[in-house]
Amino acid sequence: DQVTKFFVMDNASSFATGIQILPIFDLVYVQNDGVSFGMFGGMPWWGLSALALLICAVLGVLLFRSDNRIEAVALGAIIGGALGNVVDRFRFQAVTDFLSFHIAGLYWPAFNLADVFVVCGVGVLLLYPVWDARRQA
């Protein structure tokens, strides 16, 4: 996550106008002072960082108590992604986003790899119990 953000920031002038990779996918440079989808934009960076660290601490306790590898990997992905964005907040008071998907003029808010880890981890935590129940039925 941090390596990709470093690359984007190092080439910010190129990414500022967007680089089309596919007709529906661009690489862009956005500094997001909120959380996912820009929610809570304008909230102090340190407040968002403190909240993220508190959530990571709670998830860390759950991680160490977990006896399920899939759950542990999902929790680790969430914690890792959240900490990647906390690093940005401490360094730049905002998070670097650079992945932009769009279709027919509709744009999904830009995001980064840390966000991908968080979303995938949450997805696994939500879907694994359903899959496991079906598997054991």
Residue map of PLM features:
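Alpha-helical transmembrane bundles and membrane-interface segments of multipass inner-membrane proteins
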Residues: 2-137
